[in-house]
């Protein structure tokens, strides 16, 4: 992320829950007043989600992480869809993609996350079974290529040597 006078070019976020409009919950699971789990909170993700020119969300594709609606709005995606984001005055363009171990979700015209790509060995049925809403496929859904040995080396040795993400 590069920032100058709140001009954030690109941000990478994660969260405990991501809903069908790319909203992120990193605050509580369950009712706010009596949560099942209290989480760390925004930690700056709210500002990144609201102001970044481009924002990408990275998370494992698990049913518990992909409810139809988040329990709490920590960071704004496309809120309730449509022009809700613009109506609230949130400047950034919203999440460009949600990257998971199964595939890549991208917003459609309404701001709803749809399956834009599947990774090798993964199926739409597998993605749907791990998503809490009726997941749609993008009209031009593609299949990602397996990484080359050199790409894996760079990821494992240079970008993520402690294996936090891979």
Model regions and ranges:
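Conserved phosphate- and dinucleotide-binding cores of soluble alpha/beta proteins
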Residues: 4-136, 147
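A conserved C-terminal secondary-structure "cap"
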Residues: 134, 138-166
